[in-house]
Amino acid sequence: MNKFLKEFKDRGFFYQCTGEENLSQLLDKEKIRAYIGFDCTAESLHVGSLLQIMCLRLLQKHGHQPIVLLGGGTTRIGDPSGKDKTRTILSEDEIEKNINNIEKILKNFLDDKDPETKPIFVNNYTWLKNLNYISFLRDVGKHFTINKMLSFDSVKIRLEREQSLSYMEFNYMILQAYDFLELNKKEKCMLQIGGSDQWGNIVNGVDLIKRYSNNHVYGLTTPLITLASGAKMGKTESGAVWLDKKFLSSYDYWQFWRNIDDRDVLKFLKIFTDINVDEIENIKDDNINELKILLANKATSMLHGEDEARKCQETAKQTFSENSLGDNLPTTQINKKMLDDNISILDLVILSKLESSKSEIRRLIKGNGIKINGQAISDEKFLITEDLFKSSLIKLSLGKKKHIKVELI
Protein backbone atom coordinates (compact mmCIF):
# COMPACT_ATOMS: atom_id res chain seq x y z
CA MET A 1 0.00 0.00 0.00
CA ASN A 2 1.14 3.54 -0.75
CA LYS A 3 2.84 5.27 2.23
CA PHE A 4 0.41 8.19 2.29
CA LEU A 5 -2.63 5.89 2.30
CA LYS A 6 -1.05 3.63 4.93
CA GLU A 7 -0.46 6.52 7.31
CA PHE A 8 -3.91 7.89 6.45
CA LYS A 9 -5.34 4.59 7.71
CA ASP A 10 -2.95 4.13 10.64
CA ARG A 11 -3.93 7.52 12.05
CA GLY A 12 -7.65 6.81 11.81
CA PHE A 13 -8.32 9.23 8.93
CA PHE A 14 -9.80 6.64 6.55
CA TYR A 15 -13.50 5.98 5.94
CA GLN A 16 -14.17 5.31 2.22
CA CYS A 17 -12.30 5.56 -1.06
CA THR A 18 -13.16 5.30 -4.74
CA GLY A 19 -10.77 3.03 -6.66
CA GLU A 20 -8.42 2.59 -3.69
CA GLU A 21 -6.00 0.22 -5.43
CA ASN A 22 -5.67 2.48 -8.47
CA LEU A 23 -5.23 5.54 -6.24
CA SER A 24 -2.48 3.75 -4.32
CA GLN A 25 -0.67 2.96 -7.58
CA LEU A 26 -1.02 6.57 -8.76
CA LEU A 27 0.41 7.92 -5.49
CA ASP A 28 3.35 5.51 -5.78
CA LYS A 29 4.11 6.76 -9.30
CA GLU A 30 3.78 10.52 -8.90
CA LYS A 31 3.15 13.46 -6.62
CA ILE A 32 -0.39 14.72 -7.06
CA ARG A 33 -2.61 17.64 -6.17
CA ALA A 34 -5.58 16.96 -3.90
CA TYR A 35 -8.25 19.32 -2.64
CA ILE A 36 -10.42 19.83 0.40
CA GLY A 37 -13.24 22.37 0.45
CA PHE A 38 -14.12 24.56 3.41
CA ASP A 39 -17.47 26.15 4.11
CA CYS A 40 -17.30 29.91 4.74
CA THR A 41 -20.52 30.43 6.69
CA ALA A 42 -18.64 31.53 9.84
CA GLU A 43 -15.71 33.86 10.44
CA SER A 44 -13.69 31.04 11.99
CA LEU A 45 -13.33 27.29 11.66
CA HIS A 46 -13.61 25.17 14.82
CA VAL A 47 -11.98 21.88 15.81
CA GLY A 48 -14.67 20.02 13.88
CA SER A 49 -12.66 21.02 10.77
CA LEU A 50 -9.34 19.96 12.26
CA LEU A 51 -9.31 16.43 10.81
CA GLN A 52 -9.53 17.89 7.29
CA ILE A 53 -6.67 20.27 8.14
CA MET A 54 -4.59 17.31 9.36
CA CYS A 55 -5.27 15.63 5.99
CA LEU A 56 -3.79 18.68 4.25
CA ARG A 57 -0.70 18.46 6.48
CA LEU A 58 -0.34 14.74 5.75
CA LEU A 59 -0.47 15.41 2.01
CA GLN A 60 2.40 17.87 2.42
CA LYS A 61 4.38 15.44 4.58
CA HIS A 62 4.28 12.87 1.77
CA GLY A 63 5.27 15.36 -0.93
CA HIS A 64 1.83 16.04 -2.41
CA GLN A 65 0.40 19.51 -2.99
CA PRO A 66 -2.85 20.44 -1.24
CA ILE A 67 -5.44 22.69 -2.81
CA VAL A 68 -7.60 24.56 -0.31
CA LEU A 69 -10.96 25.44 -1.82
CA LEU A 70 -12.76 28.24 0.00
CA GLY A 71 -16.43 28.09 -0.93
CA GLY A 72 -17.10 31.72 -1.75
CA GLY A 73 -19.58 30.64 -4.42
CA THR A 74 -21.23 27.64 -2.76
CA THR A 75 -21.52 29.48 0.58
CA ARG A 76 -23.98 31.74 -1.22
CA ILE A 77 -26.22 28.65 -1.49
CA GLY A 78 -25.45 26.46 1.52
CA ASP A 79 -24.58 22.77 1.72
CA PRO A 80 -27.66 20.75 2.79
CA SER A 81 -25.49 17.80 3.95
CA GLY A 82 -26.27 17.02 7.58
CA LYS A 83 -28.70 19.95 7.86
CA ASP A 84 -32.40 19.75 8.62
CA LYS A 85 -33.23 23.28 7.51
CA THR A 86 -32.09 25.89 5.01
CA ARG A 87 -29.05 27.89 6.11
CA THR A 88 -29.20 31.63 6.55
CA ILE A 89 -27.78 33.31 3.44
CA LEU A 90 -24.90 35.67 4.20
CA SER A 91 -24.16 39.00 2.54
CA GLU A 92 -21.31 39.38 0.03
CA ASP A 93 -19.26 41.36 2.58
CA GLU A 94 -19.77 38.75 5.31
CA ILE A 95 -18.65 35.93 3.01
CA GLU A 96 -15.57 37.87 1.89
CA LYS A 97 -14.64 38.62 5.51
CA ASN A 98 -15.06 34.95 6.43
CA ILE A 99 -12.92 33.79 3.49
CA ASN A 100 -10.05 36.10 4.41
CA ASN A 101 -10.09 35.05 8.05
CA ILE A 102 -10.36 31.32 7.36
CA GLU A 103 -7.42 31.52 4.95
CA LYS A 104 -5.32 33.14 7.71
CA ILE A 105 -6.26 30.36 10.13
CA LEU A 106 -5.37 27.62 7.64
CA LYS A 107 -1.99 29.20 6.93
CA ASN A 108 -1.08 28.66 10.60
CA PHE A 109 -1.21 24.91 10.00
CA LEU A 110 0.34 24.60 6.53
CA ASP A 111 3.94 24.87 5.36
CA ASP A 112 4.53 27.30 2.50
CA LYS A 113 8.33 27.02 2.22
CA ASP A 114 8.53 24.20 -0.34
CA PRO A 115 7.12 25.30 -3.74
CA GLU A 116 6.34 21.64 -4.56
CA THR A 117 3.97 21.26 -1.60
CA LYS A 118 2.98 24.88 -0.92
CA PRO A 119 -0.82 25.04 -0.55
CA ILE A 120 -2.83 26.51 -3.41
CA PHE A 121 -5.76 28.61 -2.19
CA VAL A 122 -8.73 28.96 -4.54
CA ASN A 123 -12.19 30.50 -4.24
CA ASN A 124 -14.90 28.73 -6.25
CA TYR A 125 -16.74 32.02 -6.74
CA THR A 126 -14.04 32.73 -9.35
CA TRP A 127 -15.59 30.25 -11.80
CA LEU A 128 -19.14 29.92 -10.47
CA LYS A 129 -19.99 33.63 -10.77
CA ASN A 130 -19.65 33.59 -14.57
CA LEU A 131 -21.60 30.41 -15.31
CA ASN A 132 -24.17 30.65 -18.09
CA TYR A 133 -27.26 28.80 -16.91
CA ILE A 134 -28.27 27.37 -20.31
CA SER A 135 -24.73 26.22 -21.12
CA PHE A 136 -24.31 24.76 -17.63
CA LEU A 137 -27.51 22.70 -17.93
CA ARG A 138 -26.52 21.49 -21.38
CA ASP A 139 -22.86 20.67 -20.65
CA VAL A 140 -22.96 19.62 -16.99
CA GLY A 141 -26.59 19.09 -15.96
CA LYS A 142 -27.09 16.36 -18.56
CA HIS A 143 -24.69 14.12 -16.62
CA PHE A 144 -26.92 14.07 -13.51
CA THR A 145 -30.13 12.11 -13.04
CA ILE A 146 -32.84 13.16 -10.60
CA ASN A 147 -33.16 9.48 -9.62
CA LYS A 148 -29.59 9.39 -8.34
CA MET A 149 -29.70 12.85 -6.76
CA LEU A 150 -32.75 11.83 -4.73
CA SER A 151 -30.87 8.80 -3.38
CA PHE A 152 -28.22 10.82 -1.52
CA ASP A 153 -28.67 11.18 2.23
CA SER A 154 -28.43 14.99 2.15
CA VAL A 155 -31.61 15.01 0.05
CA LYS A 156 -33.34 11.77 1.07
CA ILE A 157 -33.37 12.46 4.82
CA ARG A 158 -34.83 15.94 4.41
CA LEU A 159 -37.59 14.64 2.14
CA GLU A 160 -38.38 11.64 4.36
CA ARG A 161 -38.80 14.01 7.31
CA GLU A 162 -41.00 16.22 5.14
CA GLN A 163 -38.60 19.12 5.72
CA SER A 164 -38.35 21.66 2.94
CA LEU A 165 -35.39 21.48 0.56
CA SER A 166 -35.06 24.43 -1.77
CA TYR A 167 -34.16 24.07 -5.44
CA MET A 168 -31.13 26.20 -4.61
CA GLU A 169 -29.85 23.64 -2.06
CA PHE A 170 -30.77 20.73 -4.34
CA ASN A 171 -28.30 22.13 -6.88
CA TYR A 172 -25.44 22.30 -4.35
CA MET A 173 -24.22 18.79 -5.16
CA ILE A 174 -23.95 19.66 -8.86
CA LEU A 175 -21.89 22.75 -8.08
CA GLN A 176 -19.54 20.78 -5.81
CA ALA A 177 -19.06 18.20 -8.54
CA TYR A 178 -18.36 21.06 -10.95
CA ASP A 179 -15.72 22.41 -8.54
CA PHE A 180 -13.83 19.12 -8.85
CA LEU A 181 -14.13 19.28 -12.65
CA GLU A 182 -12.73 22.83 -12.71
CA LEU A 183 -9.83 21.92 -10.42
CA ASN A 184 -9.06 18.87 -12.51
CA LYS A 185 -8.97 21.01 -15.68
CA LYS A 186 -7.13 24.03 -14.28
CA GLU A 187 -4.92 22.56 -11.54
CA LYS A 188 -4.68 18.88 -12.59
CA CYS A 189 -6.28 17.93 -9.27
CA MET A 190 -6.63 14.15 -8.98
CA LEU A 191 -8.18 13.65 -5.55
CA GLN A 192 -10.89 15.18 -3.38
CA ILE A 193 -10.88 14.54 0.37
CA GLY A 194 -13.86 15.29 2.60
CA GLY A 195 -15.92 14.13 5.56
CA SER A 196 -18.07 11.01 5.32
CA ASP A 197 -21.17 13.19 4.86
CA GLN A 198 -19.63 14.43 1.59
CA TRP A 199 -19.37 10.97 0.00
CA GLY A 200 -22.28 11.48 -2.38
CA ASN A 201 -21.03 14.88 -3.50
CA ILE A 202 -17.50 13.54 -4.01
CA VAL A 203 -18.69 10.52 -6.03
CA ASN A 204 -20.72 12.92 -8.19
CA GLY A 205 -17.54 14.82 -8.98
CA VAL A 206 -15.58 11.67 -9.80
CA ASP A 207 -18.38 10.49 -12.13
CA LEU A 208 -18.79 13.91 -13.77
CA ILE A 209 -15.08 14.12 -14.64
CA LYS A 210 -15.14 10.60 -16.09
CA ARG A 211 -18.15 11.42 -18.28
CA TYR A 212 -17.04 14.92 -19.21
CA SER A 213 -13.37 14.37 -20.03
CA ASN A 214 -12.74 10.63 -19.52
CA ASN A 215 -10.18 11.41 -16.79
CA HIS A 216 -9.86 9.06 -13.81
CA VAL A 217 -9.88 10.89 -10.49
CA TYR A 218 -10.50 9.74 -6.93
CA GLY A 219 -12.43 10.49 -3.76
CA LEU A 220 -11.40 9.80 -0.18
CA THR A 221 -13.48 10.40 2.94
CA THR A 222 -12.78 10.66 6.66
CA PRO A 223 -14.99 9.38 9.49
CA LEU A 224 -17.14 11.55 11.72
CA ILE A 225 -15.07 12.12 14.86
CA THR A 226 -17.03 12.07 18.10
CA LEU A 227 -15.94 12.40 21.70
CA ALA A 228 -16.15 9.37 24.01
CA SER A 229 -19.23 11.03 25.50
CA GLY A 230 -20.93 10.75 22.11
CA ALA A 231 -20.84 14.51 21.54
CA LYS A 232 -19.79 15.92 18.17
CA MET A 233 -16.18 17.01 17.83
CA GLY A 234 -15.99 20.79 17.87
CA LYS A 235 -18.68 21.60 20.41
CA THR A 236 -18.61 21.70 24.21
CA GLU A 237 -21.12 22.75 26.83
CA SER A 238 -19.51 26.19 26.66
CA GLY A 239 -19.88 26.45 22.88
CA ALA A 240 -17.71 25.89 19.82
CA VAL A 241 -13.96 25.29 20.15
CA TRP A 242 -12.87 27.96 17.68
CA LEU A 243 -9.51 28.07 15.90
CA ASP A 244 -9.40 31.88 15.98
CA LYS A 245 -7.91 33.53 19.06
CA LYS A 246 -10.52 36.29 18.80
CA PHE A 247 -13.23 33.79 19.70
CA LEU A 248 -11.32 31.37 21.96
CA SER A 249 -8.14 32.14 23.87
CA SER A 250 -5.07 29.96 23.38
CA TYR A 251 -5.40 28.95 27.04
CA ASP A 252 -8.99 27.75 26.60
CA TYR A 253 -7.90 25.91 23.46
CA TRP A 254 -5.09 24.23 25.42
CA GLN A 255 -7.55 23.36 28.19
CA PHE A 256 -9.94 21.75 25.71
CA TRP A 257 -7.26 19.21 24.79
CA ARG A 258 -6.00 18.84 28.37
CA ASN A 259 -9.51 17.94 29.54
CA ILE A 260 -10.22 15.34 26.86
CA ASP A 261 -11.77 12.12 28.18
CA ASP A 262 -9.15 9.47 29.03
CA ARG A 263 -10.71 7.14 26.44
CA ASP A 264 -10.00 9.63 23.62
CA VAL A 265 -6.37 10.49 24.36
CA LEU A 266 -4.51 7.87 22.30
CA LYS A 267 -6.94 8.18 19.39
CA PHE A 268 -6.55 11.96 19.37
CA LEU A 269 -2.75 11.81 19.62
CA LYS A 270 -2.85 9.87 16.34
CA ILE A 271 -5.40 12.10 14.64
CA PHE A 272 -4.57 15.59 15.89
CA THR A 273 -0.77 15.57 16.29
CA ASP A 274 2.18 14.79 14.03
CA ILE A 275 3.74 12.38 16.54
CA ASN A 276 4.85 9.18 14.81
CA VAL A 277 2.25 6.42 15.16
CA ASP A 278 4.87 3.92 16.41
CA GLU A 279 6.00 6.41 19.04
CA ILE A 280 2.40 6.80 20.24
CA GLU A 281 2.19 3.00 20.59
CA ASN A 282 5.38 3.05 22.68
CA ILE A 283 4.04 5.65 25.13
CA LYS A 284 0.44 4.41 25.34
CA ASP A 285 0.94 3.06 28.89
CA ASP A 286 2.47 6.29 30.22
CA ASN A 287 0.67 8.37 32.85
CA ILE A 288 -2.62 9.49 31.30
CA ASN A 289 -2.30 13.07 32.57
CA GLU A 290 1.17 13.38 31.04
CA LEU A 291 -0.27 12.15 27.73
CA LYS A 292 -3.06 14.73 27.97
CA ILE A 293 -0.51 17.50 28.49
CA LEU A 294 1.45 16.18 25.50
CA LEU A 295 -1.73 16.26 23.39
CA ALA A 296 -2.58 19.79 24.57
CA ASN A 297 0.94 21.07 23.87
CA LYS A 298 1.19 19.53 20.41
CA ALA A 299 -2.30 20.61 19.32
CA THR A 300 -1.83 24.15 20.65
CA SER A 301 1.67 24.49 19.14
CA MET A 302 0.29 23.66 15.72
CA LEU A 303 -2.20 26.53 15.85
CA HIS A 304 -0.70 29.12 18.19
CA GLY A 305 3.02 28.24 18.24
CA GLU A 306 5.31 26.45 20.72
CA ASP A 307 5.89 29.52 22.93
CA GLU A 308 2.16 30.03 23.37
CA ALA A 309 1.68 26.34 24.23
CA ARG A 310 4.40 26.54 26.89
CA LYS A 311 2.77 29.64 28.39
CA CYS A 312 -0.58 27.85 28.50
CA GLN A 313 0.95 24.87 30.30
CA GLU A 314 2.64 27.20 32.81
CA THR A 315 -0.61 29.10 33.35
CA ALA A 316 -2.42 25.82 34.03
CA LYS A 317 0.29 24.83 36.51
CA GLN A 318 0.03 28.19 38.31
CA THR A 319 -3.77 28.05 38.33
CA PHE A 320 -4.28 24.47 39.45
CA SER A 321 -1.12 23.42 41.33
CA GLU A 322 -0.07 26.74 42.84
CA ASN A 323 -3.58 28.23 43.14
CA SER A 324 -2.36 31.53 41.70
CA LEU A 325 -3.25 33.71 38.72
CA GLY A 326 -1.58 32.33 35.61
CA ASP A 327 -0.36 34.89 33.06
CA ASN A 328 -2.31 33.36 30.16
CA LEU A 329 -5.56 32.91 32.05
CA PRO A 330 -8.46 34.47 30.09
CA THR A 331 -9.37 37.91 31.45
CA THR A 332 -12.63 39.81 31.61
CA GLN A 333 -12.88 43.42 32.75
CA ILE A 334 -15.47 45.24 34.83
CA ASN A 335 -15.65 48.93 35.61
CA LYS A 336 -15.35 50.09 39.24
CA LYS A 337 -18.55 52.07 38.81
CA MET A 338 -20.43 48.80 38.25
CA LEU A 339 -19.71 47.82 41.86
CA ASP A 340 -21.91 50.70 42.99
CA ASP A 341 -24.86 48.83 41.46
CA ASN A 342 -24.46 45.96 43.97
CA ILE A 343 -23.22 43.25 41.59
CA SER A 344 -23.83 39.78 43.03
CA ILE A 345 -21.78 36.65 42.40
CA LEU A 346 -24.58 35.52 40.10
CA ASP A 347 -24.26 38.74 38.06
CA LEU A 348 -20.47 38.43 37.92
CA VAL A 349 -20.56 34.90 36.52
CA ILE A 350 -22.96 36.02 33.78
CA LEU A 351 -20.90 39.15 33.00
CA SER A 352 -17.77 37.03 32.71
CA LYS A 353 -19.57 34.67 30.27
CA LEU A 354 -18.51 31.61 32.23
CA GLU A 355 -22.16 30.54 32.44
CA SER A 356 -25.35 32.13 31.14
CA SER A 357 -27.99 30.06 32.96
CA LYS A 358 -29.00 31.49 36.34
CA SER A 359 -30.43 28.16 37.45
CA GLU A 360 -27.14 26.41 36.63
CA ILE A 361 -25.19 29.08 38.55
CA ARG A 362 -27.47 28.62 41.57
CA ARG A 363 -26.95 24.85 41.38
CA LEU A 364 -23.17 25.34 41.33
CA ILE A 365 -23.31 27.74 44.28
CA LYS A 366 -25.29 25.21 46.34
CA GLY A 367 -22.63 22.61 45.60
CA ASN A 368 -19.72 24.96 46.46
CA GLY A 369 -18.79 24.93 42.79
CA ILE A 370 -18.15 28.66 42.43
CA LYS A 371 -15.07 30.21 44.00
CA ILE A 372 -13.42 33.61 44.25
CA ASN A 373 -9.67 33.46 44.87
CA GLY A 374 -10.05 29.81 45.87
CA GLN A 375 -12.82 30.43 48.42
CA ALA A 376 -16.22 28.83 47.81
CA ILE A 377 -19.19 31.22 47.63
CA SER A 378 -22.27 29.70 49.25
CA ASP A 379 -24.73 32.61 48.94
CA GLU A 380 -26.12 33.62 45.54
CA LYS A 381 -26.68 37.14 46.92
CA PHE A 382 -22.99 37.53 47.82
CA LEU A 383 -21.93 41.02 46.67
CA ILE A 384 -18.74 41.77 44.77
CA THR A 385 -16.80 44.52 46.55
CA GLU A 386 -13.56 46.33 45.73
CA ASP A 387 -11.67 44.80 48.66
CA LEU A 388 -11.88 41.35 46.99
CA PHE A 389 -9.59 42.52 44.18
CA LYS A 390 -5.90 42.05 44.95
CA SER A 391 -3.90 44.32 42.63
CA SER A 392 -7.20 44.92 40.79
CA LEU A 393 -7.62 41.19 40.02
CA ILE A 394 -9.61 38.22 41.28
CA LYS A 395 -9.69 34.62 40.13
CA LEU A 396 -13.21 33.40 39.42
CA SER A 397 -13.66 29.63 39.21
CA LEU A 398 -16.54 27.40 38.12
CA GLY A 399 -15.95 23.84 39.17
CA LYS A 400 -12.45 22.44 38.89
CA LYS A 401 -11.70 23.29 35.28
CA LYS A 402 -13.11 26.74 34.43
CA HIS A 403 -11.05 29.68 35.65
CA ILE A 404 -10.73 33.30 34.54
CA LYS A 405 -9.23 36.52 35.82
CA VAL A 406 -11.59 39.41 36.49
CA GLU A 407 -9.86 42.77 36.27
CA LEU A 408 -11.23 45.91 37.89
CA ILE A 409 -10.68 48.98 35.71
UniProtKB/Swiss-Prot annotation:
Pfam family, one: SYY_C-terminal
GO cellular component: cytosol
Regions crossing the membrane: none
UniProt domain S4 RNA-binding: residue ranges: 343-409
Motif ('KMSKS' region): 232-236
Record flagged with keyword Protein biosynthesis: yes
Subcellular location: Cytoplasm
GO biological process: tyrosyl-tRNA aminoacylation
CDD domains, sorted: S4, TyrRS_core
Enzyme class: ligase
Positions with a binding annotation for L-tyrosine: 35, 172, 176
EC id: 6.1.1.1
Motif mapping: 'HIGH' region: 40-49
UniProt-annotated binding residues for ATP: 235
Any one Gene Ontology molecular-function term assigned to this protein's record: ATP binding
Keyword match Ribosomal protein: no
InterPro entries: aa-tRNA-synth_Ic, Rossmann-like_a/b/a_fold, S4_RNA-bd_sf, SYY-like_C, Tyr-tRNA-ligase, Tyr-tRNA-ligase_bac-type, Tyr-tRNA-ligase_bac_1
Record keywords: Aminoacyl-tRNA synthetase, ATP-binding, Cytoplasm, Ligase, Nucleotide-binding, Protein biosynthesis, RNA-binding
Family stated for the protein in its record: Belongs to the class-I aminoacyl-tRNA synthetase family. TyrS type 1 subfamily.
Function: Catalyzes the attachment of tyrosine to tRNA(Tyr) in a two-step reaction: tyrosine is first activated by ATP to form Tyr-AMP and then transferred to the acceptor end of tRNA(Tyr).
Subunit and partners: Homodimer.
Protein name: Tyrosine--tRNA ligase
